[in-house]
């Protein structure tokens, strides 16, 4: 009886964990050494949270073999957006810049939750000069070749 209870509890906790993780917003993190250079793990069907800073531009860089095909935004007016190959240059230019953005490349689809705020200074650790996507499957493929 105790075994059955533990199995049920384990199954419930596993389900709860999967539900929470699948609805989590993914945030960029610093690579180490330079806080303004950030990476973000690509997770299919995740929403990536981006915080832009007024008066500063950021590059979002996708895989080298990706090319941007379409960018759409809920409210594009507050943002300056310049696509270039596998990169997007982003800069908030108006107040109330909260919106969403979808990027479709030749390989993947990305969903972004967009926000903007003022930076404390050019050395603000929340400021991102570049955000590079990292793809776990590509990392595994490279390791298996070595």
What are these regions (language model features)?
Residues 1-10:
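Bacterial N-terminal signal peptides that target proteins for export
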Residues 10-19:
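Bacterial N-terminal signal peptides
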Residues 22-146:
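A general "mature secreted/periplasmic domain" signal
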């Amino acid at each position: 009886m105790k075994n059955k209870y533990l199995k049920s509890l384990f199954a419930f906790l596993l389900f709860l964990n999967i539900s929470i993780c699948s609805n989590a917003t993914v945030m960029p993190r610093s690579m180490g050494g330079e806080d303004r250079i950030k990476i973000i793990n690509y997770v299919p069907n995740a929403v990536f949270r981006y915080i832009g800073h007024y008066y500063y531009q950021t590059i979002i860089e996708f895989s080298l073999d990706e090319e941007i095909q379409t960018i759409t935004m809920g409210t594009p007016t507050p943002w300056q957006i310049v696509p270039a190959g596998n990169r997007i240059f982003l800069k908030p230019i108006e107040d109330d810049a909260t919106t969403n953005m979808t990027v479709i490349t030749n390989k993947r689809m990305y969903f972004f939750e967009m926000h903007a705020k003022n930076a404390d200074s050019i050395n603000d650790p929340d400021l991102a000069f570049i955000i590079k996507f990292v793809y776990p499957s590509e990392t595994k493929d490279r390791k298996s070749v070595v």
